[in-house]
């Protein structure tokens, strides 16, 4: 809860310390590429948790309003967003109740954009096993780091993804690192506003 209120992510560093930070903008000295350092790769693109349209509404919606699916929420709609990729497949709407603090601070659109972008990011997950614990600069792979990815076979040519998780292994088969990678949008922090931050709250 504290990290959400502060708009922070948290994860372990290689030395065991806990780091509180924002979504990473730091780039590794090298990345992963087909035919170079990748031993195994698996890419999952899952549309089951994505929607064509997102509608943010206030709490004052009445169940009686459900008689008209197309217009029932018009009077309480605060923000909308459309996922163009999901919209090409089918119409699928998601209704989101916007928190009162976000309504009062005019952040409803931000909240709906976050809902859509996070679902987009989490729907695209790449898992790779590579032959080294470190990038070309000798630095250990770390979560929240952007790396270049080039895997044409999986339709991921020359893209950039964020490291979500790292597992280092050393056994009879050698030294390996397993990386879980996603688009940075998967880790954007959910908007939040304290009541005390709202104009006129303490007056």
Spans of model-derived segments:
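Acidic, small/polar-enriched beta strand-loop surface segments
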Residues: 4, 9-120, 127, 135-172, ...
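Intrinsic-disorder/low-complexity, polar/charged segments enriched in Ser/Thr/Lys/Arg/Asp/Glu/Gln
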Residues: 125-127, 176-178
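A generic structural motif
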Residues: 17-19, 177-181
């Amino acid at each position: 809860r504290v990290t959400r209120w502060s708009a922070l992510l948290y994860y372990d560093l290689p030395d065991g310390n806990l780091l509180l930070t924002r979504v990473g903008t730091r780039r590794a000295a090298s990345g992963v590429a087909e035919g170079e350092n990748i031993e195994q790769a698996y890419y999952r693109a899952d549309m089951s948790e994505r929607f064509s349209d997102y509608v943010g509404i206030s709490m004052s919606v009445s169940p009686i309003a459900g008689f008209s699916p197309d217009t029932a929420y018009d009077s309480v709609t605060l923000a909308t967003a459309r996922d163009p990729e999901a919209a090409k497949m089918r119409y699928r709407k998601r209704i989101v109740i916007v928190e009162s603090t976000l309504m009062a601070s005019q952040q409803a659109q931000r909240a709906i954009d976050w809902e859509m972008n996070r679902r987009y990011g989490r729907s695209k997950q790449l898992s790779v096993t590579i032959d080294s614990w470190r990038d070309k600069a000798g630095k250990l792979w770390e979560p929240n780091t952007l790396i270049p990815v080039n895997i044409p076979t999986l339709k991921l040519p020359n893209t950039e993804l964020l490291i979500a998780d790292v597992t280092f292994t050393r056994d009879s088969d050698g030294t390996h690192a397993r990386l879980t990678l996603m688009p940075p949008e998967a880790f954007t922090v959910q908007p939040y506003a304290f009541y005390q931050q709202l104009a006129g709250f303490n007056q």
